[in-house]
Design a protein with these regions (language model features):
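Adenosine-phosphate binding glycine-rich loop
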Residues: 192-251, 390
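Conserved lysine of the Walker
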Residues: 263
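NTP-dependent small-molecule kinase module
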Residues: 240-248, 253, 269, 273, ...
Length: 406
């Protein structure tokens, strides 16, 4: 069996092993190698083929006796293959991956002014692909002539591409630029894939600008890497299949609805059925506050509780592959929407008001439920990706959610 893997200095969690397991039958490991140990690893390491990530995409080039034309032109290698004679051959699959992302997004870059945010390791490849597709590229960096202090020069940009790690997990909720500075912007791409929707993409969505994240690029470059590893041709349909599988695994299932509408019950059943962790924003608030929700209301009122709730959602919403039950009033703060939507599909559980319990729920106890529902229903609708009737059995509700996800 071939010995393949991902080479980098600090890898943390990687989706690459799961992607390559879908592509071919070879072992795929993670190789964290310190810079001082890189020469010995490349010359004597026990591997047949590798993907290469930061900070080694340029550092491996002197150890290659052969380079593909694209790797030579870009001066960047993210695929290494050990030949039969023991020498290393370098290639670049990132270019294929980014071009696939552009085409899949439907964003037309030909003849358009494209701003590339960042001049780090991925930027040169992205610039080359955009230029090849006919875009007029300007690079925005922290210290170059075109920088974040003079973005007003580029208000006519039509396409924005983020190549920086700004907004990447775990530091979500941040964006390198404010898209309102670019009134002619007609497309936004972000090569970050975790979270699925970065703050930049969320703003693009809110402004009605076509946009796409980096997961397509990640899967497409893995497919191209596998072709180089195994000297075979793989149908591009595999990219779509694996992308769909990953999205399903990474996406949170978020439940919203009135207090007592069954969110915690349904979350527990979904988590058991799908073998996912279950998260609860009310439980997170109680844990961090060190007191019950009624006590929080008694001590500081609803505003104090809502502030704690938003902090809890900021922490829980950036996780992935979980089932998240929220408090009934989380929709009262607009800033909670991106926290839930960045990695989640949001389901509004609807239940007849007569069936809703009030015990232990301060807002429900103080308010007329019909009036509370009338106030919140438009907010639930604004947050929700899907509406689920929860007047049947819990098992029936779970099945309805699974059908939507399928």
């Amino acid at each position: 069996m071939m010995r393949c893997g991902l080479l980098g200095e600090k890898l943390g969690h990687s989706y690459s092993p799961a992607i390559h397991a879908q592509l071919a039958d070879y072992a795929y490991g993670l190789y964290e190698v310190a810079p001082k140990a890189l020469p010995a690893f490349l010359t004597g390491g026990d591997f047949d083929a590798l993907n290469v990530t930061i900070p080694y995409k340029k550092a491996v080039i002197p150890y290659c006796t052969g380079l593909s034309p694209i790797a030579r032109r870009l001066g960047s290698v993210n695929v290494l293959v050990r030949r039969a004679d023991g020498t290393l051959y370098g290639d670049n699959a990132d270019a294929f991956g980014f071009e696939y992302l552009v085409r899949r997004s439907g964003i037309d870059v030909a003849g358009q002014k494209a701003l590339v945010l960042g001049n780090g390791g991925a930027s040169a490849t992205i610039q080359a692909v955009l230029e090849q597709l006919g875009a007029h590229v300007t690079v925005i960096s922290r210290h170059g002539p075109d920088n974040y202090e003079n973005l007003d020069r580029h208000a006519d940009a039509h396409v924005i591409v983020n190549t920086t790690p700004v907004g990447m997990y775990p530091n979500t909720g941040r964006a390198a630029v404010d898209l309102r500075q670019f009134p002619q912007c007609a497309g936004v791409l972000d090569i970050v894939y975790n979270p699925a929707r970065t703050a930049l993409l969320l703003q693009a969505e809110s402004l009605g600008i076509p946009c796409a994240g980096g997961l397509y690029m990640l899967v497409a470059q893995a497919k191209r890497s596998c072709e180089v590893f195994t000297d075979t041709v793989i149908d591009d349909a595999q990219i779509l299949r694996i992308h769909r599988l990953l999205r399903q695994e990474m996406e949170n299932i978020v439940l919203i609805g009135m207090p007592g509408s069954g969110k915690s019950t349904i979350a527990a059943l979904l988590a058991e059925r799908l073998h996912r962790p279950v998260l609860d924003s009310d439980a997170q608030v109680v844990e961090t506050a060190g007191m019950s929700i009624p006590d929080i209301f008694a001590a500081g009122g609803e505003d104090a509780f809502r502030a704690r709730e938003t902090a809890a959602l900021a922490e829980l919403g950036k996780r992935s592959g979980a089932v998240l039950a929220t408090g009934g009033g989380c929709v009262c703060r607009a800033e909670n929407y991106p926290l839930l939507h960045q990695n989640g599909t949001i389901f509004w559980l609807q239940r007849d008001l007569a069936l809703l319990p009030k015990d232990g729920r301060p807002i429900s106890q103080r308010s007329d439920l019909a009036a509370l529902y009338a106030q919140r229903a438009p907010l639930y609708a604004r947050f929700a990706d899907a509406v689920i009737d929860n007047n049947g059995t819990p098992e029936e509700t779970v099945q309805k959610i699974l059908e939507v996800l399928a």
